[in-house]
C-alpha cells in the first residue's frame, strides 16, 4: 500500500506558475515609467517610452532600431555565457540596441562594460539594480532577452509581456510554459523561443525577431497585443491552487 501511494504521489504532480502583482506592474498607472499605456494605445505609449529611455541611457533615439532589454542576475544559469559568445557578432552586424541592468559574476559584468565602451551607440549597461530603471526597461524596450539554462518559473518574462515587450526566451521550465512561440503562418504567439542551449541558435532567434520587428509591423503589434492580454496575475494562480485543493479534498 505504501508503494502504491508513493507511485501515485510521483505520478500526480501539478505545476502552478507564479503570479505577478498586477497592481505593482501596471502600464496604465506605473509611477516609474514615462508614459502610461494599455493594450489599445500601446503603439504611441511604447514609442514615447522608448525614446525617453534611449535619451536617458545616452543611446541614439532611433524608433526603427530594435531596443532589447535585459534585467537579470548575471550568472551562467541565466544564460550569460551564450550572450557573451555572440555579443560582438550581434552588435557588429545588426541594427540593434541593448539596455542592460543587473549584477552578478565579474566576468559578465566586465563583458558588458567592455561592449558598452566598444559600441557606445548600441549598448548601455547599468551594473547594479534600480527598481525605477527596471520598470522603465520593461515598459520601453521592444524585446526582452531571457536565455536561461534553466528557469523553474521566472517573473521577468511575465513583466515584459505585461508591458508589451516581446520576450525572446529559451524553451525551458516556466519560460516554455508562459511564452508561446510566434508562428508567422498562423499569426499566433506572444514571443520568440529557441530549444537548444546554443549561442548561435539564440543569435538566429534574435535575428528572426529583428526581421519581424523591421518588416512585419502588423505581426509585431499582434505579438505585443496578445502578450498584454495574457493573465498571469496572482488571482489566476490563486484560482489554480484553489482548484487543486478542491481536487485533493475530493480524492480523500
Residue ranges and their predicted role:
Residues 1-10:
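Single conserved hydrophobic/aromatic residue that forms the stacking wall/gate
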Residues 13-65, 196, 200-216, 222-225:
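Glycine-rich phosphate/pyrophosphate-binding loop
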Residues 18-19, 136-229:
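Catalytic binding pocket for nucleotide-activated donors in carbohydrate/polymer assembly enzymes
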Residues 62-77:
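Conserved donor-binding/catalytic core segment of Leloir-type glycosyltransferases
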Residues 68, 83-86, 98, 241:
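A structural motif in glycosyltransferase catalytic domains
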Residues 75-88:
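A conserved mid-protein helix/loop that constitutes part of the nucleotide-sugar donor-binding site
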Residues 94, 99-136, 193:
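Nucleotide-activated donor-binding/catalytic signature segment of Leloir-type glycosyltransferases, i.e.
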Residues 234-252:
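C-terminal alpha-helical cap of glycosyltransferases
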Amino acid at each position: 500500500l505504501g508503494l502504491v501511494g508513493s507511485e501515485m504521489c510521483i505520478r500526480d504532480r501539478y505545476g502552478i506558475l507564479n503570479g505577478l502583482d498586477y497592481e505593482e506592474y501596471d502600464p496604465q498607472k506605473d509611477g516609474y515609467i514615462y508614459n502610461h499605456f494599455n493594450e489599445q494605445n500601446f503603439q504611441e505609449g511604447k514609442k514615447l517610452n522608448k525614446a525617453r529611455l534611449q535619451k536617458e541611457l545616452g543611446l541614439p533615439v532611433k524608433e526603427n532600431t530594435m531596443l532589447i532589454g535585459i534585467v537579470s542576475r548575471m550568472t551562467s544559469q541565466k544564460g550569460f555565457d551564450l550572450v557573451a559568445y555572440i555579443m560582438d557578432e550581434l552588435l557588429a552586424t545588426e541594427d540593434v540596441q541593448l539596455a542592460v541592468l543587473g549584477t552578478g559574476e565579474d566576468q559578465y559584468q566586465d563583458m558588458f562594460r567592455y561592449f558598452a565602451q566598444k559600441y557606445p551607440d548600441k549598448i548601455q549597461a547599468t551594473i547594479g539594480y534600480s527598481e525605477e530603471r527596471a520598470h522603465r526597461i520593461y515598459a520601453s524596450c521592444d524585446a526582452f532577452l531571457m536565455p536561461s539554462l534553466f528557469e523553474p518559473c521566472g517573473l521577468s518574462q511575465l513583466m515584459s509581456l505585461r508591458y508589451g515587450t516581446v520576450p525572446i526566451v529559451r524553451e525551458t521550465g516556466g519560460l516554455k510554459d508562459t511564452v508561446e512561440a510566434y508562428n508567422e503562418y498562423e499569426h499566433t504567439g506572444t514571443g520568440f523561443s529557441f530549444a537548444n542551449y546554443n549561442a548561435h541558435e539564440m543569435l538566429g532567434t534574435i535575428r528572426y525577431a529583428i526581421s519581424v520587428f523591421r518588416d512585419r509591423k502588423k505581426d509585431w503589434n499582434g505579438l505585443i497585443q496578445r502578450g498584454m492580454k495574457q493573465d498571469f496575475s496572482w488571482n489566476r494562480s490563486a484560482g489554480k491552487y484553489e482548484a487543486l485543493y478542491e481536487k485533493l479534498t475530493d480524492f480523500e
